[in-house]
Amino acid sequence: MKTETPRSVKTGPLISSTGQVLSRSVAFSFTLDPTLEQRILFAKCAGARRVAFNHHLGRVKESLYVRSSEKAYCGAALTPGLSWSKISFINEFNAWKNGQLESSPVNDDATRGLSWRGEIPESVFECASSDAAQALANWDGSKKGQRAGAVVGFPRFAAKGRATPSFRLRNRTREGITQSIRFTDSAHLRLPKIGVVKVLGPTRQIRRMLNRGRFHVYSATLTQRGGRWTVALTGVAAVFHPAQRSSNQRHQLPVGVDRGIKSLAVCADSDGQLLVAFEGVRELRHAEQHLIRAQKALARTTRGSKGYESARARLKKRHRSVALTRKHLLHQVSRYLVKRCSTLVVEDLNVAGMVRNRHLAKSISDAAMGELRRQIEYKAPWYGVEVVVASRFFASSKTCSGCGAVKSMLSLSERLYVCEYCDLTIDRDLNAAVNLARWTPDTPIVVST
């Protein structure tokens, strides 16, 4: 379907002004504290992003419909197809919003183009066009079997009120020119055509990396969730320095991390010693109680009323509170492990398959097993920790950590592992953690004994 060849791009890693090789993808996220005028401008930018994104989807959808109805036509009689490349989308929308096309909107004063286009940064429209092109490419590749992962459907229109308000700004830089996205001090971030916005939270790490040429910002993505605006600064960073151990005493033996529903993580070493068990579920359940009350309050209102919108806004805040509670717990667990262990062994769980169990789907999703592994894997290089991923088919829970016998059946209700051969009685999560700590790539996969 694509008819244009994308322009050639430079290959190889980026070299900073200080000679640093920037090849590691990194993102820093901060909460913003914008003024009322900036909040209004943010909302306008998010709306402009929806306009550009929906514009391209509408064009492509109409073109596909017309061409599908012309299947019996000859090649010369067919309606020409549209190019789905990012550059063609950007050029077409620029011409459309500037009033250079016949399809451009007509204003009340008979002028063509979007009358409010001057209020919005150009990169908002460009990034929205790139997002639309990428979404269509994902759908096309999935349909042809050229894209790995789950099946991707045709992109959905970004409806106001349903789509999360978000937009992206590019960091335009040239040699000798100040970057358009930069920190003015420890608590303020300058964004192109928006100005200086107050940032909440510590920014020392990213500012030091920027000053030393160890990080380059590509773009800033602003998103509104639960009534708060956040910014994610995405770019490339220099490779890590040789791993430096922290001053804390590290556990030298391999540590197995068993992720579960009852406990977020149970950690034990290869000698069978329990190091730590992270519960965390109680705090999450407490936060969900407020969420349940907000959901009931929303159910009592009339859809479309002011009370409905107020209750809906309160519900969004509660959802954000639950999400932040879960995120905080996971960061506590992952940070503790990478700072106090030298080798971590985690299991390659099929989380997508586990959530298909409708009785356990919510508990498995709350435990965020995949997210915990992701955090451990990306934080491990910071502290020089080795992460070993055990085979998905290794029966860590069914294997006896005392004699190595493997049970044929072990229900989830059995919280204690009782071995029939050596009479070992041990908590099932602790037993699994010990087995993981002892796992090696040469460990045989035994179904049962």
Predicted stretch roles:
Residues M1-T449:
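Nucleic-acid substrate recognition interfaces
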